[in-house]
Amino acid sequence: MLVFTKKYFTSDGILKDEYILNFHRILGDMPTAGHELRCYYDVLAFISEHQDAEHRRTIVAKHFKDGIDSPIFKSTLNTDLYPYQREGAVFAVRVGRCLIGDDMGLGKTIQALAASELMAKLFSIRKALIVSPTSLKYQWKTEIEKFSSRSAEVVEGYSGQRQKLYKNDSFYQRLPEHSEC
């Protein structure tokens, strides 16, 4: 067990960075001496987050060799994006999730749609859930249908109605703010 521990962990008992992405190797090499091996959910979630992040970095490096001037943007939306919007979309794709905090009127909606469309192309995501103020629910639907080739579903109504809407095939779904749920 000592040899195993020295190979995979620091002297403080922390998993060495180079093994985070190959955690399955650790599980395979771990001597159990006939004992049950238990790995808790939070550990697996932590490892999964790191593996997902590395996968995103690899895909972004492959498809955005020219950075914000990469050709993938030409077929992303039915409009051209400003350089800062492309930058925001690439950032969102690379990190997986983020808040876009630009000033009013600078195209946060377009950046979010571009990021969603890029994630659909690159990672095969099947749905995007948009949470926005109630006053903007149909504005989002209009913008989605204007700038993308997809439909959008506003998820609203009583619980049973919402459950049916969640099962809809629409790529974009707009969720009402908490007070409506």
Question: How should each PLM-predicted stretch be described?
Answer:
Residues 1-62:
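Charged, low-complexity intrinsically disordered regions
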Residues 2, 15, 75, 92-93:
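Residue-level detector of transmembrane insertion/anchoring sites
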Residues 17, 64-81, 87, 106-181:
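SF2 helicase/translocase NTPase motor core
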Residues 92, 103, 133:
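P-loop (Walker A) phosphate-binding loop of NTP-binding proteins
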Residues 93-94, 117:
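Short, locally clustered residues in the helix-turn-helix/winged-helix DNA-binding domain
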Residues 97:
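Walker A (P-loop) ATP-phosphate-binding motif of ABC ATPase nucleotide-binding domains
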Residues 100:
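Hydrophobic anchor at the beta1->P-loop junction of P-loop NTPases
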